[in-house]
Each structure stands twice: as C-alpha cells, then as structure tokens.
C-alpha cells in the first residue's frame, strides 16, 4: 500500500523538476536568437553565403534549441504518463500520444535541417535566412510551452512566466530593430505576432465557467491559438526537413558521382 502511494508522489516530484526547466528553456531561446543575430551583425556581405562554418553556426543555434525544447516536452510528457494519464479519459490519451508524435517529428525534422541546410549554398547576399531563423525560434518557444501546458506539465500562468515575457519581448525588440531595413520584413511581423500571442496565452482565465457549461471567450481563443501555432510550427519544420532530405540526397549523389569520375581517371 505504501509502495503504491509513493508512486504518484515520485511522479509529481519529477513533474516539478520538469517545471523548473522552464527558465533554462526561455534563456536558451533568447541565446539562440541573439547568437544568430550576432553572426549576422559581424559578418561581411557575402561571408555567410560562402562560409559553411557560419551557415552551420546559424542553423544549429536555431534547430538545436528546437531539439532541446521538444525533447524536454517529450520527457515531461512521459512523466505525466507515470502519474495520471493512464487513468485519464480517451481524449486525454489521444492528446498525450499526439503531443509525443508532434515532438518526435519536430526533433527529427530539426536534426535533418542542421545537416541539410548548411551544406546548401545560400543564394542571397549575407544570408537572409540568418534573419528569418531567430523569428522562428519565438514560435518554437510558443509551441513547446503550449504543448507542455496542454498536459499540465507547465502552466503558462506560472510565476516564472513573467521572466519569459521579458526575455521573449526583449528578443522580439532585438529582431525588429535589427531587421527593419532589411529584405526579410517577415521577421518583424513574426516577432510582433509571437509576442502578442504569448501575452494572450498568458492571460488568467478569470471568467472561465465550470466545466459543465460553455467555455469562456478567453478559453476558446486559447484553443484556437494553440491549434494555429502548433500547425504552423509543424508545417514549417516538416517543410524544412523535407527540403533538407533533398539537399542531403543531392549532396550524396554528387559525392558518389565525383568519386566515380576520379576513379575513372585513374
């Protein structure tokens, strides 16, 4: 009896540990953004375009964050399974497996992007992808936070969320001030949109009605935003992952072709 009663306690302790990972997660999001912007700022006109190392730094700083954040989400999800998901409703179990699938897909797509995107030549001067990737980090942060909050591993209205707001809004300001005069104005709109979404999702649902009655407007708005953000992030990363597969396959074919020609010469 005591052994069984200790299991929920251990699971809750593990969930609390997952909650404490939220602050490093927000710091890593900002570091990912700032590192890309730093490389963008110090590089010459065609330096990023011609340098494989710089392209790798920019790409890995963005997608490594995605791998970390969704791996943490997957870990927190597994902790929930140990506590109470097994006894939950069918809907909650479906949500649980859906979150796991999304997390795994995004992790795999990000790994492919880290390998594929840098080896492709960037045709634009000074690599505008360097300006676009930091904006995507904001949506990646939102998606991982939303996935965690969906199953209760992390609450968007925790006290730590004030720190998240400051850090994310600061990152958005850095992007908007840096990219205002550049070709990728979408960085500006992405950063502003993600900041607004984060503010909305952080609102306490004070007018929420009991579960037996119709959900409040704030609750319905959060569900819509949750769905849109997750779909957007999934589509973007799956698209980049598919492109990366094509780039990797082409690089392998070119390598095999060049090796074949070299052998024919000898």
From Swiss-Prot:
Stored InterPro entries: UPF0328
Pfam families tied to this protein: DUF2463
Family: Belongs to the UPF0328 family.
Name under which the protein is recorded: UPF0328 protein ECU03_0130
Organism: Encephalitozoon cuniculi (strain GB-M1) (Microsporidian parasite)
Organism ancestry: Eukaryota, Fungi, Fungi incertae sedis, Microsporidia, Unikaryonidae
């Amino acid at each position: 009896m005591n052994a069984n009663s200790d299991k929920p306690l251990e699971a809750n302790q593990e969930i609390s540990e997952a909650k404490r990972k939220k602050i490093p997660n927000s710091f890593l999001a900002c570091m990912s953004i700032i590192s890309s912007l730093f490389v963008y700022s110090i590089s010459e006109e065609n330096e990023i375009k011609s340098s494989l190392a710089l392209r790798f730094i920019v790409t890995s700083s963005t997608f490594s964050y995605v791998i970390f954040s969704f791996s943490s989400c997957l870990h927190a999800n597994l902790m929930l399974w140990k506590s109470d998901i097994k006894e939950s409703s069918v809907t909650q179990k479906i949500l649980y497996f859906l979150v796991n699938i999304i997390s795994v897909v995004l992790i795999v797509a990000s790994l492919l992007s880290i390998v594929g995107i840098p080896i492709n030549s960037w045709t634009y001067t000074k690599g505008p992808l360097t300006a676009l990737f930091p904006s995507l980090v904001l949506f990646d942060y939102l998606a991982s936070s939303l996935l965690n909050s969906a199953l209760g591993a992390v609450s968007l209205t925790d006290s730590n969320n004030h720190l998240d707001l400051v850090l994310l809004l600061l990152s958005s300001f850095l992007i908007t001030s840096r990219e205002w005069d550049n070709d990728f104005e979408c960085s500006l709109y992405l950063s502003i949109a993600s900041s607004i979404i984060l503010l909305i999702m952080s609102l306490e649902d004070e007018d929420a009605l009991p579960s037996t009655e119709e959900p409040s407007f704030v609750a319905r708005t959060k569900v819509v935003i949750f769905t849109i953000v997750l779909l957007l992030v999934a589509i973007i990363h799956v698209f980049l992952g598919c492109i990366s597969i094509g780039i990797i396959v082409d690089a392998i074919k070119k390598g095999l072709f060049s090796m074949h020609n070299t052998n024919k010469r000898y």
